[in-house]
Regions:
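Membrane-embedded beta-barrel scaffold of Gram-negative outer-membrane proteins
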Residues: 200, 297-299, 303-321, 471, ...
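A beta-strand signature from Gram-negative outer-membrane beta-barrel systems
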Residues: 143-186, 581-584, 730
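Transmembrane beta-barrel wall of Gram-negative outer-membrane proteins
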Residues: 191-220, 225-263, 284-305, 362-363, ...
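Short acidic/polar hinge/loop motifs at secondary-structure boundaries
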Residues: 127-155, 500
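Face-selective signature of the C-terminal outer-membrane beta-barrel domain
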Residues: 245-256, 286-445, 471, 530, ...
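C-terminal beta-signal and adjacent terminal beta-strands/loops
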Residues: 534, 538-539, 578, 590-592, ...
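Gram-negative outer-membrane beta-barrel transporters
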Residues: 425, 533-537, 555-655, 697, ...
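Structural signature of Gram-negative outer-membrane beta-barrels, strongest in the C-terminal barrel
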Residues: 365-367, 372-377, 404-537, 589, ...
Length: 731
């Protein structure tokens, strides 16, 4: 692994000292059109990440660290939701790889939580896709990567315009309809290892004032472990109506249904003998998602743009299974009967509206973005239901009453303003404020007899952010920013673990302060790079303290009591050596990339119930090095990519336990190196052939130790070597 990386670093360095012998091509043609990408690649071999424009009409991203991933330029395995390949050029992004279905996204940066991407503000086409960004920001829905045109990433400084979370924004951008485009579409069929079967069909058409795109994907498989089969159906429909030259109405509807069998976690001993064994045969997960959205975009001139969107989410998830730890076997009793299973069920209903407007005045010297957001989210949670003792998925209960029944509501109003002022043609200052108003409420039953009532928690506060950008040329930028963000109080924070525990009446949202300083740019058509350093301070982290009441009885008191910090380096660079040496080649183009994330994430102060303080301990699931490198070769209609990914070891618990427990729930997560190969071949105008081999060396590895019944206690292994092939036809 390190030899491969060293070779790539040497190649980059060798080419960097040769720049003076090449030509720098700069397009000086002025344009008033707002672009969605910064870099135009031309005919070079570079296929990697770009960054977002400073101002796109309603969003102001000047001086922020941003990335743009264009999936159509990738050879990656999209049908199998290969997060490791799709985010391969994104430095420092940690991917949890234990879900063969690919339904849930579990990614993080800078030592933050990987739990279903909790610390990212997850969106699709600019609107929420999580149940409640304020109280339950878990990504149980992920759009099919075969739908996604590009992925926008804005790190911590996105908080001013998007609110929570600490990690920043991830926005999946799906295909847009095109006006005056004749009827057409595409079909893709994928088969792969472990019974993978994916079918995609898409239609599109456009008239003068009306255009639409509609697609459906079915994906299923047996999974790479026993008892891990899955299936999903996702549908997406969008229609654009242009009743006037300056305005477009948009309606979008997304529907998803997914079911997966959960093979459970395994012990340390089991992993050493057979990494892909299963302990559970009767555990299941099910989710349903429905998201209607209405938008209106108004652009009367290049100076002023506005957008309003009204959105809703009606969704839910259920978990069914045998919930004991993995050292307790799920076997029938002497009478031949299995134990009853437990059923947990959530239903989410949320809706809201956002208004954004942008002003681009004085020949782009003054750019302003303002916005308003209103939101209401409701979660109805039922837990510990006594289900049947069967082996198939069923939500039928032996006792129709759930012992635990809870209802949580969040109401949110926010407003922001952000401005960028060009002091000179090369230097720009940016800054802004965001106001948040949040009301959290909850009630229900902790068990059949214990009433739970959470007091109304009303809070309001202001976040600030500043930044600066210096562009000595159109191909080079030095940028920096400092911004505040927050992780809202979650519904689980408001829920005591027992009837005797107490939650602080003055519990606050956790706060963060993020700093970025970097340099990014390009050299002609043969080099692109983005190098930065960061510091992230995270305060008011929520935890439990052991207390005693007036009767000397012990109880847990949940309050704000801890802080942590992360600092590191993020580097992405990609070059085309053939363009450097020859400008072009009759034998094709080569693109070499390297992505480096170096991260030191530690607790600064965090007292525990035992009296211990976690000061100096490493944060959980926060590897200190994430290194990826790869090579893409393109010749006419053929392209292939080989990628190597190294992830260093990390700890699964805050105490930094090295020696694993027998069940595998706690202990060191060893580092690992994985290789992926993929190719694309386009035949004539209509046919497409893609293939991939993931985990080429068939490495046994894992990225997570489970500490709960779902998806399972113990080690949750990653996928072994797997192969897939896709045939597509466009009409």
């Amino acid at each position: 692994m390190f030899c491969r990386l060293s070779f790539l670093f040497f190649s980059l360095f060798f080419c960097s000292i040769s720049f003076t012998h090449g030509k720098v091509l700069v397009d000086t043609t002025a344009s008033s059109k707002m672009l969605s990408e910064v870099f135009v690649l031309g005919n070079s071999g570079i296929k990697g990440n770009g960054s977002l424009v400073d101002f796109d009409g309603v969003r102001l991203l000047a001086a922020k660290k941003s990335e743009l991933i264009v999936l159509s330029k990738m050879d990656a395995n999209l049908a199998n939701q290969s997060f490791r390949e799709v985010f391969g050029r994104t430095p420092g992004l940690h991917v949890i790889e234990s879900d063969p279905s690919g339904f849930n996204t579990s990614i993080a940066i800078r030592g933050l939580s990987t739990n279903r991407s909790w610390d990212f503000n997850m969106r699709q086409n600019g609107y929420d896709i999580t149940p409640d960004p304020m109280g339950y920001n878990e990504a149980y829905y992920t759009p099919s990567f075969e739908w996604v045109e590009k992925i926008e990433i804005v790190r911590g400084a996105a908080a001013l315009q998007y609110g929570p979370q600490v990690g920043g924004l991830i926005n999946y951008v799906l295909e847009k309809p095109i006006f005056e485009k004749k009827f057409g579409g595409e079909v893709q069929q994928t088969f792969g290892s472990f019974g993978l079967n994916s079918s995609l069909i898409k239609f599109r058409s456009g008239m003068k004032k009306l255009a639409f795109v509609a697609s459906h994907q079915y994906r299923g498989g047996d999974g790479f472990r026993p008892n891990s089969d899955f299936n999903s159906n996702q549908s997406y429909f969008r229609v654009d109506w242009k009743p006037m030259a300056d305005g477009i109405f948009t309606f979008e509807l997304t529907k998803s249904n997914a079911q997966a069998q959960l093979g459970g976690g395994i012990s340390e001993a089991q992993f050493k003998v057979d990494p892909w064994v299963s302990n559970r045969a009767r555990n299941y997960y099910y989710s349903h998602w429905l998201m209607p959205v209405v938008k209106f975009n108004y652009s009367p001139s290049i100076l002023f743009n506005s957008q309003i969107q009204v959105f809703a989410i009606q969704s839910g998830r259920s978990q069914l299974g045998f919930t004991k730890t993995n050292d307790v076997l799920d076997v029938p009793n002497s009478a031949g009967n299995y134990a009853n299973r437990s059923l947990d069920r959530d239903e989410y209903t949320s809706y809201g509206a956002e208004f954004r407007s942008g002003l681009n005045a004085f020949n782009e010297k003054w750019q302003t973005s303002v916005g308003l957001r209103i939101f209401r989210g409701n979660m109805f949670r039922q837990q510990q239901g006594i289900a049947n003792n069967g082996s198939t998925y069923s939500e039928n209960l032996v006792d129709p009453k759930f012992p635990r029944s809870l209802n949580f509501v969040n109401q949110n109003f926010s407003a922001f303003i952000e401005n960028a002022l060009s002091i000179s043609p090369k230097f720009k200052l940016a800054g802004g404020l965001r106001y948040e108003y949040i009301l959290s409420q909850g009630d229900g039953f902790l068990d059949n007899n214990s009433k739970f009532l959470s007091p109304d928690r009303l809070r309001s506060f202001i976040l600030w952010g500043v930044g600066a950008s210096f562009k000595p040329s159109s191909a080079l930028e030095i940028y920096g920013n400092a911004s505040q963000s927050f992780r809202p109080i979650s519904f689980s924070d408001l829920l005591p673990s027992s009837t005797t525990d107490v939650v602080d009446l003055d519990l606050k949202d956790a706060r963060s302060l993020n700093f970025d300083l970097g340099i990014r740019g390009k050299k002609g058509n043969f080099l692109r790079y983005d190098m930065s350093v960061y510091f992230l301070e995270f305060t008011d982290r929520i935890g439990n303290l052991s207390m005693k009441n007036s009767n000397s009885q012990s109880y847990l008191y949940r309050t704000n009591l801890g802080s942590s910090s992360s600092k590191g380096i993020e580097l992405y660079a990609e070059m085309d050596p053939i363009s450097i040496l020859h400008g072009s080649s009759r034998y094709g183009q080569i693109s070499v990339f390297v992505s480096v994330g170096l991260n030191n994430a530690v607790y600064d102060n965090f007292p525990l119930t035992s009296g211990e303080n976690l000061a100096g301990k490493k944060l959980e699931n926060a590897p200190q090095q994430i290194l990826r490198s790869g090579l893409t070769y393109t010749y006419q209609r053929l392209s292939f990519t080989y990628q190597t990914s190294f992830t260093a070891e990390s700890f699964s618990d805050a105490q930094n336990t090295v020696k694993p427990t027998p069940t595998g729930t706690i202990g060191l997560i060893p580092g690992y190196t994985l290789d992926d190969f993929s190719f694309t071949y386009k035949y004539r105008k209509h046919w497409l052939l893609k293939g991939s081999v993931n985990n080429v060396m068939n490495v046994s590895y894992f990225t997570r130790r489970g500490t709960g019944a779902f998806p399972g206690f113990g080690i949750l292994p990653g996928a072994p070597r797997n192969v897939s092939c896709t045939l597509g036809f466009t009409f």
